[in-house]
């Protein structure tokens, strides 16, 4: 296994790298102006394993340890697993990845480390970020990159993703998500751009589309970005309406 190979070569630190990411704090919840509960709480605990087997072959595995352990019907993976892929550098310009990976969306908020984000925008909060599939990256020069990706369009069943389906909507025979992404930087890396377009068949003959654009400026200690995102689909593409219309489960803690 890759792990056995890694532990036999401790001097080659590129082969196996293990990181533990933790984000915790003290939360105080108020209800109607009065303190309801105050306690320490972990927001994120993640195990992150990366490595390079050789100059061409590499891998990445990352899993959240505090939630998302229910298996997903379509991918047969826990939602807690964010990365589980291997990559291969075909040559200096082309790189292939296969497995569960982040979707090649544009924008800069999406690309930030989740531990550094206090509150996501609705678009990034509800978009499916990690899906199983394959990706191909092409880098014509040091300042430009074009990536093409095909992944599943969802992790679980249609009902899990969209709730109760409208009359006449049937599941697609090939539930795939297609993404084209372009990244570039200009003026000696002063300006950075990250754009993407995506499409998927949500149900038979029913499609969704999304566009992500990100512009950033990085000059010494100054860093700022501005993202514009748009999504449209026959079924609730982000799950916002689905979440609002799901029946609440009543019950009291004992």
Describe these PLM feature segments.
Residues 1-96, 136-146, 218:
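Beta-barrel outer-membrane channel/assembly domains of diderm bacteria
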Residues 11-13, 57, 175, 180-254:
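Detector for outer-membrane/organellar transmembrane beta-barrel domains
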Residues 21-33, 70-80, 92-183:
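Surface-exposed coil loops of outer-membrane beta-barrel proteins
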Residues 22-30, 44-46, 53-55, 63-69, ...:
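Transmembrane beta-strands of outer-membrane beta-barrel pores
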Residues 37-41, 115-119, 155, 166-168, ...:
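Short, low-complexity, polar/charged sequence segments that are solvent-exposed and flexible
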Residues 43-47, 81-86, 130-134, 176-180, ...:
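Hydrophobic, lipid-facing positions within transmembrane beta-strands of outer-membrane proteins
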Residues 83-87, 119-125, 135, 219-223, ...:
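Short, Lys/Arg-enriched charge-dense amphipathic segments
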């Amino acid at each position: 296994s890759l792990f056995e190979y890694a532990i036999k070569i401790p001097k080659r630190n590129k082969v196996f790298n293990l990181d533990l990411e933790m984000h915790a704090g003290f939360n105080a919840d108020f209800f109607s102006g009065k303190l309801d509960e105050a306690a320490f709480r972990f927001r994120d605990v993640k195990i992150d394993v990366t490595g390079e087997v050789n100059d061409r072959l590499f891998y990445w595995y990352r899993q959240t340890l505090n939630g998302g352990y229910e298996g997903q019907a379509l991918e047969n993976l826990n939602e807690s697993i964010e990365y589980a892929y291997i990559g291969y550098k075909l040559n200096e310009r082309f790189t292939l990845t296969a497995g569960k990976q982040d979707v090649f969306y544009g924008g800069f908020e999406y690309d930030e480390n989740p531990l550094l984000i206090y509150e996501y925008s609705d678009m990034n909060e509800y978009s499916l970020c990690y899906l199983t599939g394959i990706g191909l990256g092409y880098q014509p020069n040091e300042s430009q990159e074009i990536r093409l990706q095909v992944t599943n369009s969802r992790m679980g069943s249609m009902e899990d993703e969209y709730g109760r389906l409208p009359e006449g909507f049937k599941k697609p025979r090939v539930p795939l998500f297609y993404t084209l992404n372009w990244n570039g930087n200009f003026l000696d890396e002063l300006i950075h751009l990250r754009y993407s377009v995506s499409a998927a068949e949500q149900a038979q003959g029913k499609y969704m589309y999304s566009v992500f654009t990100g512009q950033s400026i990085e000059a010494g200690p100054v860093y700022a970005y501005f993202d514009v995102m748009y999504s449209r689909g026959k079924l609730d593409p982000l799950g916002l309406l689905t979440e609002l219309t799901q029946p609440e489960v009543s019950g009291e803690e004992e």
